[in-house]
Amino acid sequence: MNPLRSIQHNIATPPISGGQPLDAVGPQAQQSHPKRISPSQLSQSAHQALERLSANAEHQRLASLVRNALQDGTFQFQSSNHTQVTYKASICLPADTDTVRTDHLINNELTVQARLNDQSEYDIVSAHLHGSSKAISFDVPSPPPAHGSASSVLSERTHLGMSRVLSQDAVDSSSLETPLLSSPDHSRPPSQPKPVHIGSVRRDSGSLVSDNPVVQALLSFAQADQAFPPQAASIAGVQLEMRPRRDIEKALEEFKGAFTVVKAQLMSGANSSERVDEDVNADIHIPLLLKAIERGAAAFGPNASIGQNSAKAFLASCAPKITSNDDVLSEFINQKLKGDDDLQVRLGAQELLHVATKKEFQLGGLAGSIGVSSILGSAWELGASELLKNAIFGKNFSPSQYALQLAGIDSVPPLIIESMDTMCVLAIIKGMKGEEWSMSDLLPKALKAGAISSVVSFPNNVLQYAGFKSRVGDLAANSVTTEAAIFGAASGIPPEVKESEELMRAGLFQSMKDGVMAHSGEGVDTKKTIERMTRHALDIAPGESTAVKSMGLASIVGMIPLIASNKATGLLSEQVLRIFRSAVFNPIEAIALNALALGGRVNVPGLFDSDNAKHARVVQTILARASQHMEAGDRDISAEELHQMLAPRSEFLRHVGSAIVNGMNASFEAIPALVRKLGYGEAPLAERIPYQDLAVPDTSRQPAP
């Protein structure tokens, strides 16, 4: 008696066969069976059943062994009765499940029970794997007859159940029941994350190859110093997946929390030889992850830890796991990865970096910005402006006569509109960074930006009423003042980027001082190293990088009203332009931020890469470097090489936006710098970082081992 029958649970699935005899008076009793059974002799339903089993994590191993043995022709006739036939194959498996070395293989007995159907094809009834220490099996019981003949019953519905039995004495009475579902997607546990990289695998000239570049790089690494077992990918339809091993978003939060620098020892504003602890709350997780990809575990100092785990162990636990419908293949690769700590650290860091740099659409901030600009801007442009001016100057006043007064009136609304819009823009940036924010934090920055916008818009407003006689000169002057007005409207962004840059520099300095991040080494300019790390991190950080690019986009799109006006091409009427200014021009930064976030998901080969494509290239490079250099010390990726993959030089908007942001910050800093030269005010944070202190590691702040 089959010990599994008593615990079988049945579920409805697609048919296993087109017609299946339920008694002895069918083809089973009329025909002798071949000495060997091959895949071509199986029914389509049997092939489908094996496919579904291969997608089930509990039964991948057994299904793969059955398919491989069928393909190799190693199943030999064993016995038969009036209902079914048994085939047996001897196969080699690792004696120790934690190793795949060929010198540890032992013989195991694989048997399948099959039944010949009305089409003279074999349906698989059950399969069993017996070894010295365990047995694995699944059964396909027959359904009870109903509504006529067996063929009609089975063509409509077949009940299929499976059981997996693990024991110390071949088979015991305990089992773990897993239903066979109708598709790989359904067989995946709900909590199991979707694969990040997936590709088909096939054999070619003795090696395994894939159509996916990342999977191909993984295969190249796995077979760099040892060939795959002959059973691996020996049949068609094999797929390999790289999927997260754990909840990556939760892991990222743990990593960020562990490496947020709360205080930094900076120079005192009064005396540069004194050190004071200053609150910085610097987020340095992105530069640390970049450094871990570049150098592996060597990126961290002796005090880098997350809870009770070292940074190295934590990142290794975040490395992706490999799954496949060929369990021999996935087991072989997972064991190769398991034995390479350096590679796991780099892959784990890349997994976290991919999530850390993901740009999310910020609907709330965008809606707020458009709402403020559309309501207040349209109310001013289409009604309030004309009513107020007519009330002050009369209905038939001459605009050129009162140009300065009119420009002054037009410069007042930006103080309100741009202040509220800047609040929305800064909230979007904070949201992209995953940071909490409050009105009290953003309001002073927003009011300052609104005041700047009001002042800077004045020259452009004057030219709307009193231009130059020369059309070329008038157009040139309007172009300059329009760009100035655009920059003024976005004046809340550059200081935000600068603040992030200064805090990150201070955080990296302190982490290196405390032995969290590895010291840059003797003869290396530490200041330049930290500045480069900061620049590379901000170029891919979701908030800052998008903000910088939005400045470049706004500087281009913001010129449309001028180009379409009667000062240039005259394509649009003044009424239409007023609506455009209210609906598009005023909230251009918020629109640009979200447009760029969505644009990061678009991939056009040969033109620009999506964020996913960039990170896939990083994974491919990590694996390729590991294949070329089996020693961890020879695998380092240069900072510039990694930066080029994630932030290519071809990113036009980033270069334009960076020039604008740096120029605006320099102009904002001009007057405070002059005041400091006169002996007033305190040096900015960036100038109070004592890089010279890193010449000797600070052991006083390091915890005892």
From Swiss-Prot:
Q: Where is the composition biased (Low complexity)?
A: 173-184
Give the protein's biological function.
Effector protein involved in non-host recognition.
UniProt keyword Secreted present: yes
Q: Where is the composition biased (Polar residues)?
A: 1-11, 28-41
Q: Which UniProt keywords apply?
A: Hypersensitive response elicitation, Secreted, Virulence
For this record, the Gene Ontology CC terms, alphabetical, are: extracellular region
Gene responsible for this protein: hopD1
Can you name this protein? Answer: Effector protein hopD1
Superkingdom of source: Bacteria
Q: Which InterPro entries match?
A: Plant_immune_effector (IPR053430)
Region (Disordered) residue ranges read 1-41, 173-207
Which GO BP terms, alphabetically? symbiont-mediated perturbation of host programmed cell death
Subcellular location per the Swiss-Prot or TrEMBL entry? Secreted
